[in-house]
Amino acid sequence: MRVLARSLLVVASVAVLAVSAFAWAQVRILDRSTASASVIGSGAGTAAEQNILLLGVDSRTDPQGNPLPPALLDALHAGGSGDGGDTADSIIVVHVPAGGGRATAISIPRDSFVQLADGYGKHKINSAYSRGVADTTDALTSGSASAGAPTSAYAPQAAPAPSPNDPAVRRAALAAGARTTIDTVQALTGLTITHFASVNLAGFADVSQAIGGVPVCLRAPVDDSYSGLALPAGPQLVSGTQALAFVRQRHGLANGDLDRVVRQQVFLAGATSKLLSAGTLANPFALSRLSGVMARSVTLDSGWDVLSFATQMQGLSAGSVTFRTIPTGTMELSTPEDGQAVQVNPAQVRSFVTDAIDVDSGIAPPPQPVPSDAAVMRAASQSDSSSSSDSSGGSDSSGGSGSSGDSGSSDSSSGSDSSGGSGSSGGSGATAAAPPAPVPAPITAAAPGCVN
């Protein structure tokens, strides 16, 4: 019996070692097969703490610059190969503290009106990527057969300019778009970006399938013809084309792009929870599927050591990532060239980012919640009804809470300050009367909750 037990132990040990070796090999394959781009400045990737810029790009090509198949675009409700415009429609900075600990993921709404890097002026932040792509494409393809024409019949013929669809041109252009976006995000947040990852349209669908679906929860059923999303209310798993539609839908949502930002956060929270709690990073078969997805849909900066990062990620628990959204002002900011945009105050964004990281990492205590206008009004009403009409205490109570008229004004100003105060203070004359955007509550990977 003892010999049998030892034999079983040996067999089990060999099996564990074999599976572990296969998993490690899959991580190495993932590291080698993923497309890379030189987009991070020298020395930025050596910091102990990590600030990772994640972009979801509305691109119709794969990381190697090849066009996505028309059948796939049709299935994704993504239009044709000429649609999309190479805009960064999902922008998230993930801060991982030195030595591990709680990570903070901060979303930047795609329509945020900010100063772009590389001299592009003030525009919506999602266009930083597309402007870098377009200008680099033009620069690489502007030559012609007549440029540098031979001076004699015996001179070699000039090579024709490459096509904008040439995979090498696309790769260079996408890298330029990434660099412009990185510099823009660094200036807005005050963080030094140490690593970069982008995923194309197919990536959300592919990743969700590779991990067996992503848990999400909807407050109400959805049937959206624009994105192709058709889901019932309540908790459920989304994968494939429905996963992409879940993070892309904004038509029919009360807060438009801000609700889409929350959708993206909930999706990533669910994916993070499933990856970490289910031990996907230690599952060789899941890693095998993920390596194929990475090759088709993901681009990383060339200096990113995926093996070390995978080891670091295994130290995180499922609930150790908090998702937040930068403070914003009005969602109806009139702009000279870009239509309506989301107003942001860069100084306030930098302060918010610093405070959020300190709170999530445990350096600072969480702030006390600010009562809403409705709560203040209810408190004032209850105070008035419980006091006599001629009591001076009622006057003091009303004054203490700020009379109902002043209270609403004061709290609204305070509330807008925490959500991007420049919006309600009238930083732009055309939008001074517009209300500030609602402040999305933080979302944790452990309990993301239901969304619109």
Regions found by a protein language model. Name each.
Residues 1-452:
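Non-catalytic, solvent-exposed segments at the cell envelope interface
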